[in-house]
Amino acid sequence: MSIIKTNSEILNQLLYGQDLDAETSNTLMKRWLNDEILEVQTGAFLSALRAKGATGTELSSMADVLLNACKLPVERPNLFMVDTCGTGGDGANTFNISTAVAFVASSCGVNIAKHGNKSASGKVGSADVLLNLGINLNSTLEKVISSIDQIGITFLFAPVWHKSLIKLAPLRKALGIRTVFNQLGPLVNPLRPNAQVLGVASDELLNPMASALSRMEMDRAIVVHGYGGLDEASLEGDNKIIFVDKGELKHSKINVSDFNYQNTSNKDLIVSNDDSYEDILKSVLNGSGQKAHLDVVALNTALVLWVAGIEDDIEKGFKKALFSMSKAEPWNKFLLLKNYLES
């Protein structure tokens, strides 16, 4: 028979650097959702978890609680879905690469269920840029779900689906540090995608995030930490990769030079004061963007095509994505989504 631990006992365990088992992690998250943890304790828990480092067991167990609390208003479409949501937080001020990748991958035949939020930092988040380009983030939940069946892509705005976490936002902002909830964000897509490409801003997050995805029975996934600290695959050098395939984890590296493409500096991806996140995203989707922008989106799209089982060769996936952008197919996909969610 398991022993139910008090909040103080769990906190002490974390302060001593001891990992939580699945049951205790589950209990902790349920107490957060049920308002059974004082605000001062929440600050201590989040700080202690950050200092210790969350494990795959802790992350997957907490994510399960959040997913079970998030009920779909209609049945999940019987489709193989992929998410491109990452942890963010690289501080590089690049354009919205994973958002662009979602539309390019969808134009290449992948059913994309993109989970995302507004930015908590100075950078424009996926929800910010889509909202500014006219995507209706307040469409009915039923319409958001049916969109992936009708259009091949949808966007799930996190606060709409995980209302129970909104109450923690002021404290998280006051703490001023990245917490376990930044890691949980990519793991709690309400549509429970079959596969995912998940970018992390620190190589210390590679193993726990891959372990969490494996424990959550993700069919296929890639966790990537980009060269130079990007939370996307970079064009500049070696990118650290963990392939998750039916529970098996395989460490690898990928570099565009492997298929005879020239390395390009991460600086070419930075949004300057004269640039607009929205204009850059539009130019990428319609194929008129800068070469570095198109190439980095193509590289990351190739990873999505791999997890989706559409293209097992990264170089071929890279070229497939470039071709789709050259035909403005991702922009057409964007317009379809915009019109569908408006109607």
Swiss-Prot record:
Q: Which UniProt keywords apply?
A: Amino-acid biosynthesis, Aromatic amino acid biosynthesis, Glycosyltransferase, Magnesium, Metal-binding, Transferase, Tryptophan biosynthesis
Q: Which cofactor does it need?
A: Mg(2+)
| Enzyme class, first EC level, given as a word | transferase
Name the Gene Ontology biological process terms.
Answer: L-tryptophan biosynthetic process
Q: Which SUPFAM superfamilies does the record associate with it?
A: Nucleoside phosphorylase/phosphoribosyltransferase catalytic domain (SSF52418), Nucleoside phosphorylase/phosphoribosyltransferase N-terminal domain (SSF47648)
**Residues noted as binding Mg(2+) 2 in the record, renumbered to the chain:** 231-232
Which residues are noted in the entry as anthranilate 2-binding? 172
Write out the catalysed reaction: N-(5-phospho-beta-D-ribosyl)anthranilate + diphosphate = 5-phospho-alpha-D-ribose 1-diphosphate + anthranilate
Q: Which residues bind anthranilate 1?
A: 86, 117
Q: List the disulfide bonds.
A: none
Is Membrane given among the entry's keywords?
no
Q: What do the Gene Ontology cellular component annotations say? A: cytosol
Q: Which residues bind 5-phospho-alpha-D-ribose 1-diphosphate?
A: 86, 89-90, 94, 96-99, 114-122, 126
User: What Enzyme Commission number(s) does the record list for this chain?
Assistant: 2.4.2.18
Would you say which domain of life the source belongs to?
Answer: Bacteria
What's one GO MF term for it?
Answer: anthranilate phosphoribosyltransferase activity
Query: Does the keyword field hold Ubl conjugation?
Result: no
Quaternary structure note: Homodimer.
Family membership noted in the UniProt record: Belongs to the anthranilate phosphoribosyltransferase family.
Recorded hits in NCBIfam families, A to Z, give: trpD
Indicate what this protein is called per its UniProt record.
Anthranilate phosphoribosyltransferase
